[in-house]
Amino acid sequence: MAKEELIQFEGLVTEILPDARYRVQLDAGHEIVAYTAGKMKKNRIKTLAGDRVTIEMSPYDLEKGRLIFRHKDERPGGPPRSGPPRGGQFRRR
């Protein structure tokens, strides 16, 4: 199937399921099961319950989808996320 035939929806992750799957509530009101796309796994992008995501679906099976994008946090007033310390205090002499 060509990529031109896939359709995209936006939604909210409501539940994390086993085997790297997620239950997603679409903006249209439907609830589907989605799995993480390979590029997201490769780049170690974590998805948590409550995240806004973009889902790619086949028009032939509207019950399953592929999670292709996690939108950045849009929570007002929250501090920006910072990664773990890089270990700069220990240097080789």
Swiss-Prot record:
Output the Pfam families linked to this UniProt entry: eIF-1a (PF01176)
Q: Where in the cell is it found?
A: Cytoplasm
The entry's keywords: Cytoplasm, Initiation factor, Protein biosynthesis, RNA-binding, rRNA-binding
> In the UniProt record, which is one GO cellular component term?
cytosol
Domain S1-like, chain residue ranges per copy = 1-72
Molecular-function annotations in GO: ribosome binding; rRNA binding; translation initiation factor activity
Where is the segment annotated Disordered?
70-93
Its quaternary organisation is:
Component of the 30S ribosomal translation pre-initiation complex which assembles on the 30S ribosome in the order IF-2 and IF-3, IF-1 and N-formylmethionyl-tRNA(fMet); mRNA recruitment can occur at any time during PIC assembly.
> NCBIfam families, alphabetically?
infA
> Function, please?
One of the essential components for the initiation of protein synthesis. Stabilizes the binding of IF-2 and IF-3 on the 30S subunit to which N-formylmethionyl-tRNA(fMet) subsequently binds. Helps modulate mRNA selection, yielding the 30S pre-initiation complex (PIC). Upon addition of the 50S ribosomal subunit IF-1, IF-2 and IF-3 are released leaving the mature 70S translation initiation complex.
PANTHER family documented for this protein: TRANSLATION INITIATION FACTOR IF-1, CHLOROPLASTIC (PTHR33370:SF1)
Q: Tell me which family the UniProt entry assigns to this protein.
A: Belongs to the IF-1 family.
Report the protein name in the record.
Translation initiation factor IF-1
Record organism: Nitrobacter winogradskyi (strain ATCC 25391 / DSM 10237 / CIP 104748 / NCIMB 11846 / Nb-255)
